[in-house]
Design a protein with these regions (language model features):
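Short glycine/serine/threonine-rich phosphate/pyrophosphate-binding segments
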Residues: 15, 63-69
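General beta-strand structural signal in soluble alpha/beta enzymes
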Residues: 33-38, 81, 113-114, 162-163
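Short glycine-rich anion-binding loops that position phosphate/pyrophosphate groups of nucleotides
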Residues: 61-64, 85-87
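Active-site catalytic pocket residues across diverse enzymes, especially alpha/beta-hydrolases
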Residues: 72
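Catalytic core of DAGKc-family lipid kinases
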Residues: 89-165
């Protein structure tokens, strides 16, 4: 793996400085590293990935990883999170491990762990289905009309599971 694409929040100076160091590190070892858009501003946008992208590095916290996963859904490119936030339970790397991991990836010494994505869509009272969404971790349901009863029907892999009022 030699060609990387970095997704990071553009509003945090320390993250941008880290991304520059990461880019320099990769390029000094013969790789390429393009920079991505802020996933917070681009939930509906497609990432414009270079054709030779072999791996996506997400620098941020869990929220950045979740939004990046939505943006790259269906692209079949490995993604790894680098914790630049607080908890980082979705991030596999941190400051102490990132450069060794980059070296290993560039040497072809890595394995890919498949993660399940959730999908869902809303159906209005007239039976019209809304846009399908993908999610890495969870889907939260809330009424846009305030305190209102919601009718929820849950299917798993196309099989009815339960209904809730």
């Amino acid at each position: 793996m030699k060609h990387f694409f970095v997704v990071a929040r553009e509003d945090k100076k320390e993250i941008l400085e880290f991304v520059q160091k990461l880019t320099d590190y990769i390029e000094k070892r013969g790789g390429t590293c393009a920079y991505g858009i802020n996933p917070d501003d681009a939930l509906e946008a497609e990432l414009d990935l270079p054709e030779d992208t072999q791996g996506i590095l997400v620098a941020g916290g869990d929220g950045t990883v979740i939004r990046a996963a939505q943006n790259i859904f269906g692209k079949n490119i490995p993604m790894i999170g680098i914790n630049r936030g607080h908890l980082g339970y979705l991030c596999d790397l941190d400051d102490a491990s990132v450069y060794d991991a980059i070296d290993a990836m560039m040497a072809g010494d890595y394995s890919i762990e498949e993660r399940m994505m959730l999908s869902g869509h809303m159906v209005d009272a007239q039976g019209n289905a809304g846009k399908e969404i993908q999610a890495l971790n969870d889907i939260v349901l809330c009424s846009s009309a305030g305190l209102q009863v919601m009718h929820v029907v849950v299917y798993v892999n196309g099989q009815y599971l339960y209904a809730y009022n």
